Amino acid sequence: MLNKDNFDTELADAERIEVLRGPQSTLYGRNTMGGVVNVYTLSPLTYEGVRLTVEYGSGDSYRFRASSYYKLSPDLGMAVTGYFTHTGGFFDNDCTGEKCDWERLGGGRWKTQWRNNRGVRIDNTFSFSALDQGGYPYAYAGEDIVRDGKTVIRNGQISYNDPSSYRRTTVSDGLTVRYDAAKYSVSSITSYQYSDDEMTLDQDFTPESWFTLRQARREHALTEDIVFRSHDGRRYGWLLGAFGFYRHGVMEAPVHFKRTGIEELIVKNANEHLGAIWNEEYSISADELPLYSDFRMPVYGGAVYHESNLRLGRWRLTAGIRFDVEHTSLAYHSRTDMDYFVSKEGGAPAPKRISIDEGNRIAHTYCEVLPKVSLLYAFDEVRNLYISVAKGYKAGGFNTQMFSDILSEKLKWRMAGSQYDEADLMSYEPEYSWNYELGGHFSCMDGAVRGDFAVFYIDVRDQQLTIFPEGQSTGRMMTNAGRTRSVGAEAALQFAPWRSLEINTAYGYTDARFVRYDNGIEDFKDNRIPYAPQHTLSAQAAWTLPTGVKWLGDVVLQAGVRCAGRIWWNEENTLSQPFYALADASVRFEHKHYSLDIWGRNLGGARYDVFYFKSIGNEFVQRGRPRTFGITLNINI
């Protein structure tokens, strides 16, 4: 999945989830810097039947899902899944009196698997989804805004006047063909994805009419990964792969300045900064000013990667390398027309007109070599210690959200007959890291206690960082911080003292700071990196009680807590989310053919924020979901 916007989807009938931390450049086609999450769904060759799910919860939320798994022959199986979810919303927009976070999501999946006795396997998964959302629960996080004695918006208030929404349609197909020979296997993994989305935003998120955005994007993505792999169980194992991808996107992103935005962002700035110099006064009579920006964004790349594994008694040495190349380009077209008036030395206003119609193409090619090495000592099949070193890399890109800022600045300067000296804000450079990790897995009490731990150090150069330029800017941009470092530890423990009781806990600590980053206005050395939680903690206990009633099955009591914080929101470290805890609990009646789950989430009603951003100098945070209750019924036929 090349587009991160498509992560928001339904994981229907997930059988297991595998998480691989850190850079993964020699196992899979697409290079990753932060890790890989593999989701494995039920196979129609190993499971047959019909699965139904019905759920209702707080916020007028409901979910329906139906799956059918069947074999057409011993070697051919198919599965068809359909789903629909609806959320009425939890947060009110005080300006409109309506819920601002409603959502509707529907889609389906068709999975086909075929095997033969000659070592050939074919898997194909076709899926589609359609998403429709309201606006966003963005609460104002600054001092109360008061104009002419009237409060415009208060701290903590969600209140904006212009429509906001998001819709997306996605179609994807993944085909895997694998052949198992006597000593190795070869796989071809081909994927295609089409996405079409449109976002409409009140970008100032206040009751005033500053400016709005409509961003419409269409994208096609094609990937191919060919992997040769030796079979397990040998002293020496190897993997060799070749990967290529092509992605092409087009985007329209017009920004419409409204009356307040025209006066405050264009006219006022022009008069204060340029009018005083030229002894002129500027005015605009229009109530709306559109700034149009169109983009075409083709990206393609390829890689060759290899990994070797050598077993020497209890020792296992793994070494890998990847050669990665990526070409990214941006063709843009920006245009606007503005009528305004200028009066010189108190004279009569004279009408004038500015027309901007310009375009260009920017392109970058990135090449990188990514090595990886690890050493593991196995005490037995479960217990081990390991150390690993890997280089991570993330390609650069373009700041499409800054084009409206650039265009409005050009308007302001051309009002005074001057040219705007355009800064190099359009692109950002790649990010590089070295990841060092020491960890292990352990087990005791005949497997009743299992766990893993890791300590890590990450040295990052040119870290890609989302920032909000100073002043009344209308966009956000990605920039490169000089150098950062992260040091921390993670541990997880599973404890099953009895067959009926299972306890799972996990804790993580991260100290992520700037080592070198100066934006020309302030030095952020030793400040904490935004959006990186200092602590994460989760704990869950499940107790299974047999009822002895055949039609009822077992009763499973579950309780847990999820915690995170502190999370700093900006480079200055002036705003943060303190440590918070979300308590969950459920009672489940579990039978062979059905389960009934009565659950509650965030039982303590914790108030917390999950996102932060700035617009025209104002700070906003996105509210996390409040206390919710619900009931879920699963039926297996």
Q: What residues fall within each predicted segment?
A:
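Gram-negative outer-membrane beta-barrel transporters
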Residues: 229, 235, 239, 311-314, ...
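Short acidic/polar hinge/loop motifs at secondary-structure boundaries
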Residues: 1-21
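Short loop/turn motifs that connect adjacent beta-strands in outer-membrane beta-barrel proteins
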Residues: 44-49, 73-76, 118-119, 183, ...
